[in-house]
Amino acid sequence: MAKLTKRQKAIAAAVEANKVYTLEEAVQVLNSLPAAKFKESLDISVNLGVDPRKSDQVVRGATTLPAGTGKTVRVAVFAQGAQAEAAKEAGADVVGFDDLAESIQGGNLDFDVVIAAPDAMRVVGKLGTILGPRGLMPNPKVGTVTPDVAGAVKNAKSGQARYRVDKAGIIHAAIGQVGFDAAAIRQNVETLVADLEKLKPATSKGVYIKKITLSSTMGPGLTVDVNNVSN
């Protein structure tokens, strides 16, 4: 039997099996674990009472997190004219139109979010095979296809959680970083959960927010009391 590493021993000592934590307790445990060699994110998984096989129960959205994510986000914008200027003023890292499409086709993908003005979708649509598999394809459902490109840039830069329910009915999102205090994580989690509740499909029956799990990149998943964060 392989020996446990120091980190694995620390995790085993810190985590109580089958315990349901308050959000503050979960953050305290994850922040107390031995640090990894990189800045770990704090991630949330929310099990929803939906059937993703049904098109009207696919929950998808974007939530602007009041305490941010702690990450530097590089944003590319497809726009021209006044919208392009507004995007630049809002802090976009790359702004272009046909030239930006050519750059992407040439392999330049040094950004985390792609935003497009509606009239740019005729150009962006041709990039689906490149942007789609990387989760970068602009979509109006998450606010990345919009005439207000400046507002979208500001939201992306300030820190957003983007999510889409997976085949198991779970959404996953980064909610901060290891080292964030519990108050900041609570702000972010409550905002995300409130948005998820607004997105509840009309055809979803029974319990909607079924389970919440908080984890760090290299750490364990801790079950959080749904009633502790849900309205």
UniProtKB/Swiss-Prot annotation:
Pfam families xref list: Ribosomal_L1 (PF00687)
SUPFAM superfamilies (UniProt xref): Ribosomal protein L1 (SSF56808)
Single Gene Ontology BP annotation:
translation
Keyword Metal-binding on entry: no
What is any one of the record's Gene Ontology cellular component terms? cytosolic large ribosomal subunit
Q: Does the keyword section mention Nucleus? A: no
InterPro entries, sorted: Ribosom_uL1_bac-type (IPR005878), Ribosomal_uL1 (IPR002143), Ribosomal_uL1-like (IPR023674), Ribosomal_uL1/biogenesis (IPR028364), Ribosomal_uL1_3-a/b-sand (IPR016095), Ribosomal_uL1_CS (IPR023673)
Keyword annotations of the record? Repressor, Ribonucleoprotein, Ribosomal protein, RNA-binding, rRNA-binding, Translation regulation, tRNA-binding
Record-level Gene Ontology MF annotations: rRNA binding; structural constituent of ribosome; tRNA binding
Q: Which PROSITE patterns match?
A: RIBOSOMAL_L1
Q: Which NCBIfam families match?
A: rplA_bact
Question: What family is this protein classified in?
Answer: Belongs to the universal ribosomal protein uL1 family.
Classification via PANTHER family = 54S RIBOSOMAL PROTEIN L1, MITOCHONDRIAL, LARGE RIBOSOMAL SUBUNIT PROTEIN UL1M
The entry describes its oligomerization and partners as:
Part of the 50S ribosomal subunit.
The protein's role, per its UniProt record? Binds directly to 23S rRNA. The L1 stalk is quite mobile in the ribosome, and is involved in E site tRNA release. Protein L1 is also a translational repressor protein, it controls the translation of the L11 operon by binding to its mRNA.
Could you tell me what this protein is called?
Large ribosomal subunit protein uL1
